[in-house]
Amino acid sequence: MRSIRLFHTSSTWLSKFKLDPNYKFKCGIEIHTQLKTKYKLFSLSPTSFYSTPNSKVSYFDCGLPGTQPKLNPEALYLALKLAVALDCEIQQNSSFDRKHYFYPDQPLGYQITQHYHPIAKNGFLELNSKFDEIKNSSKKINIEQIQIEQDTGKTTYDKFDKSVKVDYNRSNMPLIELVTKPDFEDLQQVRAFVKKYQTMVRHLDICTGDLETGAIRIDVNVSVNGNPRVEIKNLGSNSDIQDALKYEYTRQVDSIKNNEKIIQETRGWTGTKTVSLRLKEDAVDYRYVPDSELPFINLSPTIASDIKESLPELPEQILQKLTSKPYDLELKYARFLTENRDTLNYYFQLFKSVADRHHSGKLANNWFIHEFLGAFTKINVKVDLDILPANFLADLVLQVAEKNISTTSARLLLLQIIQTPEDKGKPIQDLIVQYDLGSPVDMSTEDLNDAVSDICSEIISNNADVVERIKKGQKNSIKFLIGLAMKETQGKVNAKTFSEKFNELLDL
């Protein structure tokens, strides 16, 4: 055992971790998801994440005698949305049960959940190598059930005065618990499933999808070579999930190698190792009984098809669309858009507006990803889609395509609009005139060519050392000359025009 402890004190073992084919990894996960409802699950208290402790608590939330629960239909609807999206079998009749245990954060003395008759069963989520970064071409993760339940209060242990404080704002918040089959065969599949699930609940506006804030909380069940499974509770980040699984798998493999018995238990993750919390409870310990104060949920036979018709395109369908014609986006950009609904809608509007008038979707892609979003990054401000409506950005892109403004001038104008609130909503053509950024339109082609020749000739004569490097084969040095020419003309003449003229004058 000493060698095991020494092994786990090293921080490098995590990066070198690898599953041993002689010791089969098997894993299932349970995901608790806070629903984005206006009110709590069984009371009219508003849901609140950042309010003053115990300021959003009804009589029922804190367990006062005589208070009764009333189901929030919005929570039911969100649970059904997720169940349909995951191809679950919706149960026409489901009910609530009481899970009894005593703890400060559970004032009722029991949790209302769906132990016997959950809202949905037998779904699945398909992973694939193209979008989910798994080794297999595809992997189907089966979902055992989805159930609705209430959250507990939040307990805080104050080390300074050794007090225990309970905030009941979270008590009775609506949750759905999703339980998978033990179908995960490696850590990549677990990571891919969690990320895909986060994207889905955000996309469907069911939950914020954040692990770090506790909106999603994950328990994992791990076993090796068919030995008793070990549960690890309340993993709060993707890195915690991966590290806890690596540690626990290695711990169990070491136990098997040393002929030590693996017991069925619940363990916690400290950040560096798993520690035993308690032996795994049998279901009878919780004394589940039907909740007599809540009626059965009776659903229409057509509820699944009705909800399916109301669902938006799911994230994987959008990824498939964005990475195919006519959009042809790189996967990393398609994934970014899929995870940001407002930005996705903006992109679709821009693409259609540009493609309809210019027949080039590539132009829209480049300007949206690299120029528009890049401009916000360049000046280190948060992206604000309202600053420049999609049809206005399309106008700017088309002005560049039609050579009414140079690319350099368009970039300058884009930065100006972002940094100048009073320019918001002004037509692009008016702004081009206002800032005198248009291409020279009062010059004939011959006069423009003569002017460009004069500028390029002067730059060549003033930069003999750069010209010498170009003639010796350092072709990229011509960009320096082009930059000087663009600066001289304040970006009004296209860089391509100067490039062609320099090549002509230098006989390249």
From Swiss-Prot:
Main location: mitochondrion
GO cellular component: glutamyl-tRNA(Gln) amidotransferase complex; mitochondrion
First-level EC class: ligase
Keywords: ATP-binding, Ligase, Mitochondrion, Nucleotide-binding, Protein biosynthesis
UniProt keyword Ligase present: yes
GO annotation terms (biological process): glutaminyl-tRNAGln biosynthesis via transamidation; mitochondrial translation
MF term (GO), any: glutaminyl-tRNA synthase (glutamine-hydrolyzing) activity
Location(s), subcellular: Mitochondrion
EC number: 6.3.5.-
Catalytic activity: L-glutamyl-tRNA(Gln) + L-glutamine + ATP + H2O = L-glutaminyl-tRNA(Gln) + L-glutamate + ADP + phosphate + H(+)
Cross-referenced SMART domains: GatB_Yqey (SM00845)
Pfam families recorded: GatB_N (PF02934), GatB_Yqey (PF02637)
Alphabetized InterPro entries for the sequence: Asn/Gln-tRNA_amidoTrfase_suB/E, Asn/Gln-tRNA_Trfase_suB/E_cat, Asn/Gln_amidotransferase, Asn/Gln_tRNA_amidoTrase-B-like, GatB, GatB_Yqey_C_2, Gln-tRNA_amidoTrfase_suB_CS, Gln_synth/guanido_kin_cat_dom
Function: Allows the formation of correctly charged Gln-tRNA(Gln) through the transamidation of misacylated Glu-tRNA(Gln) in the mitochondria. The reaction takes place in the presence of glutamine and ATP through an activated gamma-phospho-Glu-tRNA(Gln).
Subunit structure: Subunit of the heterotrimeric GatFAB amidotransferase (AdT) complex, composed of A, B and F subunits.
PANTHER family cross-referenced by the UniProt entry: GLUTAMYL-TRNA GLN AMIDOTRANSFERASE SUBUNIT B MITOCHONDRIAL AND PROKARYOTIC PET112-RELATED, GLUTAMYL-TRNA(GLN) AMIDOTRANSFERASE SUBUNIT B, MITOCHONDRIAL
Note: This protein may be expected to contain an N-terminal transit peptide but none has been predicted.
Family note: Belongs to the GatB/GatE family. GatB subfamily.
Protein name as it appears in the record: Glutamyl-tRNA(Gln) amidotransferase subunit B, mitochondrial
Species for this entry: Scheffersomyces stipitis (strain ATCC 58785 / CBS 6054 / NBRC 10063 / NRRL Y-11545)
